[in-house]
Amino acid sequence: MNWITNYVRPKINSMLGRRTDMPENLWIKDPETGEMVFHKDLESNQFVIPSSGHHMKISAKERLKYFLDDGRYEQLENPKVVLDPLKFRDEKRYTDRLKDAKAKTGLEDAIVNALGTIEGLPVVVTVQDFAFMGGSLGMAAGDAIVHAFEVALQRKRPLILFAASGGARMQEGILSLMQLPRTTVGVDRLKEAGLPYIVVLTNPTTGGVTASYAMLGDVHIAEPGALIGFAGPRVIEQTIREKLPDGFQRSEYLMEHGMVDMVVSRLEMRQTIARLLKMLLKMPGEQKPLEPEILPPAVVAAEARPQA
């Protein structure tokens, strides 16, 4: 039986041109409802599940493709930094973790910077990729964010930042924490120049990034259902020994309590941010041309007649 299964059947399938492999992730499960969604339907809907509206995590490059005009952009080269300055090792060496993350994502680190346009408006866009070590903030990510602010200042462009992070990168210790004040200075310089800075908080945005650049925007937009906060809900419950309210630290809860300005679907993000940029840049909105009012001759004659 093994000979038939392992040799004869594959040989017949090969001769007949049959496909014996099933593509991975052909069907994707909705984490909220358990519904199975065909991957092509999900891709065409920007990885927002049509029935429930659940926003799946997406990569930095997918984010740029969906967000910018025609999916076209120029990716900026990030500054080079010293790898593993502390020679850190836990269960694995930090350098090995970096190699694994690079192989998994195709990125050099968690930040991707790009130049592009939104409805014709030139912008600088910074995206954190959660798939790269949880989007953690280290020296490379910090330098990349500071570089994005510098490019925005040089080119006099607004900056839009998509945050997705678990916080500071523990393998870099105090060097990671130093990125909090560095990025904050970058935000201040952009604001002094009068350039808009819009932050989009995606799932999840936690830890040190919420104590720095991620909560310093002119406008804060959150994707639906995103977890946003400094410490996670489990840590808070264990610390205060109390049950947290339903939806605590989720986008909708934070908007109700004034922590974010609006909750916007990924499908409407481009139009919303373009409208905000036009307002912040004091650009004239689209106005319909005035239609001339044509009056009947009798009315014109009556208005022209001198009054007694």
Curated annotation (Swiss-Prot):
It is found in: Cytoplasm. GO terms for cellular component: acetate CoA-transferase complex. Its EC number is 2.1.3.15. GO terms for molecular function: acetyl-CoA carboxylase activity; ATP binding; carboxyl- or carbamoyltransferase activity. GO terms for biological process: fatty acid biosynthetic process; malonyl-CoA biosynthetic process. Residues 26-295 form the CoA carboxyltransferase N-terminal domain. It catalyses: N(6)-carboxybiotinyl-L-lysyl-[protein] + acetyl-CoA = N(6)-biotinyl-L-lysyl-[protein] + malonyl-CoA. The keyword Lipid biosynthesis applies. Pathway: Lipid metabolism; malonyl-CoA biosynthesis; malonyl-CoA from acetyl-CoA: step 1/1. It holds the Pfam family Carboxyl_trans. Keywords: ATP-binding, Cytoplasm, Fatty acid biosynthesis, Fatty acid metabolism, Lipid biosynthesis, Lipid metabolism, Nucleotide-binding, Transferase. InterPro entries: AcCoA_carboxyl_beta, Acetyl_CoA_COase_Trfase_b_su, ClpP/crotonase-like_dom_sf, COA_CT_N. Its main location: cytoplasm. Acetyl-CoA carboxylase is a heterohexamer composed of biotin carboxyl carrier protein (AccB), biotin carboxylase (AccC) and two subunits each of ACCase subunit alpha (AccA) and ACCase subunit beta (AccD). Component of the acetyl coenzyme A carboxylase (ACC) complex. Biotin carboxylase (BC) catalyzes the carboxylation of biotin on its carrier protein (BCCP) and then the CO(2) group is transferred by the transcarboxylase to acetyl-CoA to form malonyl-CoA. Belongs to the AccD/PCCB family. This is Acetyl-coenzyme A carboxylase carboxyl transferase subunit beta. It comes from Mesorhizobium japonicum (strain LMG 29417 / CECT 9101 / MAFF 303099) (Mesorhizobium loti (strain MAFF 303099)).
